[in-house]
C-alpha cells in the first residue's frame, strides 16, 4: 500500500490562466479530477494527500463534493516551493511504507506505469518513470550552440515517482539542512548517494503546462473515448 502525494500549491504561471491550472477543464472536467480518477482505481493506493494553497481550500473542497473520489483525500498547507509542499505532506503520512509523488497536472498516467513505479520503489527504495528523448538536444550559451548532447542515454522524466517513506524523508531533511533545491524528489535521493530505479513511462503521460498542452490533452481524451 502507498500514499499518493500531490503538490498542488503552484500558480501555473506558464499557463497564463490567472488561476490554478488544476482547475482548468478537459472535456468539462477539471484536470485534477482526471488525475485523481487515475489513482482511485488502484487498489494499492491507500489515501491521497494534497498540499494546497490555503486560499484555494474552498475550491478544492467544492470539487471533492462535486466529483467524489473513492479514496480518503486530505488537504494540507503547501509550501513556498514544490519541494516544501512534498516535505510537508510526508509529515502527514501514516501506516504506509511507500509514497508516490505525482504532478496534479498529469491526468493521463496509466495504471501500468503506476504499478511499475511502485514495484521499482519496493526494489530500489526510490523510482522514477521516464521516456527516451526524441528531439535533438543542444547545449546553448548566450544564444549560441556550444555542443550537441548525445541523447542515447537521456530520458525525459515524468511522475509518479515512488519512494520508501523513510528514504524520502531522509533525502528531504538533508536537502533542507543544506538549503538545496532540487528539480524533483528523485534528485534529492540521488544527492545522498542512493539508487533510483527507472521504469518506462508513456508519451501520453504529459504534464499540462501551457495552453497548447490543453489542446493536446483534449485530443488524448478524445482518442481514449474511442
UniProtKB/Swiss-Prot annotation:
One of its GO terms (biological process) is isopentenyl diphosphate biosynthetic process, methylerythritol 4-phosphate pathway. Its EC number is 2.7.7.60. It is an enzyme of class 2 (transferase). The keyword Flavoprotein does not apply. It catalyses: 2-C-methyl-D-erythritol 4-phosphate + CTP + H(+) = 4-CDP-2-C-methyl-D-erythritol + diphosphate. InterPro entries: IspD, IspD/TarI, IspD/TarI_cytidylyltransf_bact, ISPD_synthase_CS, Nucleotide-diphossugar_trans. Signal peptide: none annotated. The record marks 151, 207 as: Positions MEP for the nucleophilic attack. GO terms for molecular function: 2-C-methyl-D-erythritol 4-phosphate cytidylyltransferase activity. The keyword Endoplasmic reticulum does not apply. NCBIfam families: ispD. HAMAP family: IspD (MF_00108). PANTHER family: 2-C-METHYL-D-ERYTHRITOL 4-PHOSPHATE CYTIDYLYLTRANSFERASE, CHLOROPLASTIC. This is 2-C-methyl-D-erythritol 4-phosphate cytidylyltransferase. The gene is ispD.
